[in-house]
């Protein structure tokens, strides 16, 4: 992390642009690591602003994140209050979210009216608040974000070994074959969907709805959902 900051802020505020593939997944006990990733993305891309959506009550206001969470080394602690770094932070808006349905509204409204980078922290916690943390809904909202954002950063601050039902109405104790860990969802679903989407656009064949259907079929065939019918995933 220190090296990353040195490369981007250690030379008189001059930024060295690098080629980064999105989406990015960040796993850290603090959303401060995600904040740093957003700062880096803003510096490397031609966008107007960044938006960081997080569960209500799970973090501190922007001005307290660097001071109170204290996740970084001494170099960043010093550079974080530089004029250049602060000017980038001012382009990032923190949006507390109390319900996963609010996330859907935020994504659809904000991305239609601004050229921005979308960062989402702890989407699994938002689903747990609603009582619907399972593979189907986690994938549904990840797909929503991926389809509506060219530059997406997702962060989880909790453990990724937690097993959740693939679909609702399945008891983890009753059917361990139909459960999946958060790590598996993030490690297999995001890359598979992104690759399917890229190949679909490269071929550019047929109607948009047909291409999206093919992406979904490819995804279901290559993730933990393989073997399950499209009908089982109508909510997606």
Swiss-Prot record:
GO terms for cellular component: cytosol; nucleus. It comes from the Eukaryota. This is Uncharacterized protein C22G7.03. It comes from Schizosaccharomyces pombe (strain 972 / ATCC 24843) (Fission yeast).
């Amino acid at each position: 992390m220190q090296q990353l900051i040195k490369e981007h802020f250690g030379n008189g505020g001059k930024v060295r642009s690098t080629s980064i593939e999105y989406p990015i997944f960040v796993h850290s006990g603090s959303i401060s690591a995600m904040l740093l990733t957003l700062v880096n993305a803003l510096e490397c891309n031609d966008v107007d602003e960044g938006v960081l959506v997080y569960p209500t009550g799970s973090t501190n206001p922007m001005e307290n994140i660097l001071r109170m969470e204290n996740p970084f080394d001494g170099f960043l602690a010093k550079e974080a209050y530089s004029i250049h770094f602060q000017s980038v932070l001012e382009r990032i808006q923190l949006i507390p979210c109390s319900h996963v349905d609010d996330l859907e509204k935020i994504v659809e409204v904000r991305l239609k009216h601004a050229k921005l980078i979308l960062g989402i922290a702890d989407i699994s916690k938002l689903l747990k608040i609603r009582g619907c943390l399972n593979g189907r809904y986690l994938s549904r909202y990840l797909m929503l974000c991926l389809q509506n954002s060219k530059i997406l950063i997702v962060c989880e601050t909790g453990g990724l070994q937690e097993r959740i039902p693939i679909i609702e109405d399945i008891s983890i104790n009753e059917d361990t074959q139909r459960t999946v860990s958060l790590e598996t969802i993030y490690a297999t679903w995001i890359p598979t969907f992104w690759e399917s989407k890229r190949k679909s656009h490269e071929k550019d064949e047929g109607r948009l709805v047909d291409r999206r259907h093919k992406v979904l079929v490819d995804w279901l065939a290559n993730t933990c959902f393989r073997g399950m019918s499209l009908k089982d995933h109508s909510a997606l």
